[in-house]
């Protein structure tokens, strides 16, 4: 964490703990420099960060004032934590992109497949995820949803197989595009019934299977390595494409690999966005395609979207090339692992024994006892009905303990 982020967190804690109330004036920049032993630039960046998070506001020729009230008696609550976003680094990269905007002209191929510089920068990143491919197999997209939409248009003729529950927007795409489908249950522990999966593949009715292999959304679990190998083997045997959504690849530690790692026959289409490690507004995704699908995919993308936001592509290129992405990712993984350990401890200390915890994702069946106990902690669980394409979905609930500030 940068020094300005540490200072921002200290000041934020003063607000959250009630030591600074709404309307209170913060110490002057000079006083903060003396109090915390940092330079003026660090203080200004910390204040800018707090302003962007709407904790404080500036009054011209007067100073900075607290914008938010803090309820010191408030129990842990679910709210996004933006303190670790590399806003300043991204701003620097964006300004550099803006300065060179007149030179950002893409070739016809780049308009379809993405900026060459960005693809080159992401090749080693993909290898860290366990994805090995040629440059020609990569296409930059405007986020995951665009990639999924194109794939659903491209691979037609048969039904698609959806794991359930799954990414809500994939359910919406399939429903609104009126694509024929069947479902298979993704188990709460992260696994899947491989016997049933083979029966479905062997029927010859499916062209595509959509799955989230690691850190499943919404359940949180991951396939075992043996399960991944078997799924890829079945896809190869029965000529079914797998669309592997690996949106949380950045948070994987150890030797866990994606399905794509085991694919020797070009059956796995790897889809990755960077919103989970950065923020959704970035709208940059990457797809790794079997060679026979690259040209038709890129052509359809160009029909929809002449070129994915060039400024954002250049900004992200600089962010990766300058080592900022790698540094930020390591910080986020370290933070996530710490929160996972704290989440497990908090769950036990709070007396919750129902459900399953994967990382920070706690999934459980609804009960009045759990609901009542959650109210004591001012927690509102998320009902997972939107993650099912059928209205007759099982009643599962989730709490993302990573978003509890006290964790």
Regions found by a protein language model. Name each.
Residues 38, 55, 179, 240, ...:
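Short glycine/serine/threonine/alanine-rich loop segments
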Residues 122, 286, 313-321:
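Helix-loop "lid/cap" segments that line or gate small-molecule binding pockets
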Residues 1-110, 298, 302-309, 313, ...:
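N-terminal basic, amphipathic alpha-helical segments
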Residues 139, 180-184, 269, 355, ...:
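General small-molecule cofactor/ligand-binding pocket signal
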Residues 61, 263-296:
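Active-site PLP attachment segment
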Residues 105-238, 250-262:
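Conserved core of the PLP fold type I
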């Amino acid at each position: 964490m940068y020094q300005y982020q540490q200072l921002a967190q200290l000041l934020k804690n003063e607000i959250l703990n009630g030591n600074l109330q709404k309307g209170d004036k913060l110490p002057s920049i000079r006083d903060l420099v003396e109090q915390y032993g940092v330079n003026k630039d660090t203080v200004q960046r910390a204040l800018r960060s707090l302003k962007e998070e709407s904790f404080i506001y500036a009054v011209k020729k007067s100073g900075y004032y607290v914008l938010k009230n803090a309820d010191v008696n408030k129990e842990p609550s679910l709210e996004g934590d933006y303190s670790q976003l590399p806003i300043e680094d991204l701003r620097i990269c964006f300004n550099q992109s803006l300065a060179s905007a007149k030179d950002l002209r893409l070739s016809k191929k780049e308009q379809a497949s993405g900026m060459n510089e960005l693809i080159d920068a992401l090749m080693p990143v993909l290898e860290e995820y366990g994805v090995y491919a040629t440059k020609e197999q990569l296409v930059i997209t405007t986020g995951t949803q665009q990639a999924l939409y194109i794939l659903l248009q491209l691979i037609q003729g048969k039904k698609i197989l959806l794991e359930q529950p799954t990414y809500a927007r994939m359910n919406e795409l399939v429903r609104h595009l009126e694509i024929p489908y069947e479902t298979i249950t993704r188990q709460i522990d992260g696994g899947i019934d491989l016997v049933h999966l083979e029966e479905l593949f062997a029927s010859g009715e499916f062209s595509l299977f959509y799955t989230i292999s690691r850190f499943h959304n919404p359940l949180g679990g991951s396939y075992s390595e043996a399960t991944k190998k078997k799924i890829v083997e079945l896809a190869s045997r029965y000529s079914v494409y797998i669309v592997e959504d690996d949106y949380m690849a950045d948070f994987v530690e150890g030797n866990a690999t994606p399905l794509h790692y085991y694919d020797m026959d070009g059956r796995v289409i790897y889809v990755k966005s960077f919103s989970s490690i950065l923020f959704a507004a970035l709208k940059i995704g990457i797809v790794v395609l079997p060679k026979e699908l690259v040209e038709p995919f890129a052509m359809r993308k160009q029909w929809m979207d002449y070129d994915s936001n060039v400024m954002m592509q250049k900004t992200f290129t600089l962010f990766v090339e300058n080592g900022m992405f790698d540094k930020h990712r390591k910080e986020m993984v370290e933070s996530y692992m710490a929160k996972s350990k704290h989440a497990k401890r908090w769950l036990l200390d709070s007396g919750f024994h129902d459900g399953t915890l994967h990382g920070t994702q706690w999934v459980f069946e609804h009960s009045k006892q759990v609901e009542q106990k959650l109210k004591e902690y001012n927690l509102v669980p998320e009902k997972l009905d939107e993650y099912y394409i059928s209205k007759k979905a099982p009643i599962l609930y989730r709490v993302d303990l990573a978003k509890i500030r006290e964790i």
